[in-house]
Amino acid sequence: MPQSRREAIYKVIMRHDVAVIEDDPYWLLAGDAAPPIAALGLSSTSGPPVFYVSTLSKCLAPGLRTAYLVVPPSEPIEPILDALRSLSLMPAQTMVSSVTHWIQEGAAQEWMRQIRQDAGQRQKIAASILPGKPIAHPYGLHLWLELSPKLDQYRLIQTAQEQGLGVTSSDVFCPYESSPGAIRIALGGAPDHARLQVALEKLADILLSADKPQRIAAIV
């Protein structure tokens, strides 16, 4: 999300004077992302609070069930700590200690660099195989693929699932009644590039077959 869009969102937050929780799991992975919306809130002394939440399970390793919360200076932290204790008592101390050590020693940053490089290679593989022009961040772990208006995305998804491929329809992510004709494709699930390529080639074949005009046999 560009800086201009973040600033526009923060103006809406200020206009309606609402507290906001900014859930931003992929900011570290992007590498070139603009500062979070919460950073805009820190520069304002009279604006509503923006709480910033980020997790390591999305950008570093799925097993690291560790998240961080940045509380605005204007907000008391005690009620938040009470709420967290009532929900989870406390985080796993060994995991938090290990992650903190990795961050302080620079290991986490190096792993992030490797993950970012791998994600970029996966995006290039997808762009070389899939028809059309995928919509994605260069280092994203998923992409969006617009479909031809004549394609039934639900039938397409069912066909893909029958061949062991998991894709998601756009209406899962759209708050409106009508969603754009597109599918979301995750690229991080395949354990290596070779199996990712095989899966994408299967999906490309499904897309190309579905886009061909159906021949209707004449009944005599």
What do these predicted regions represent?
Residues 1-220:
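PLP-dependent class I/II
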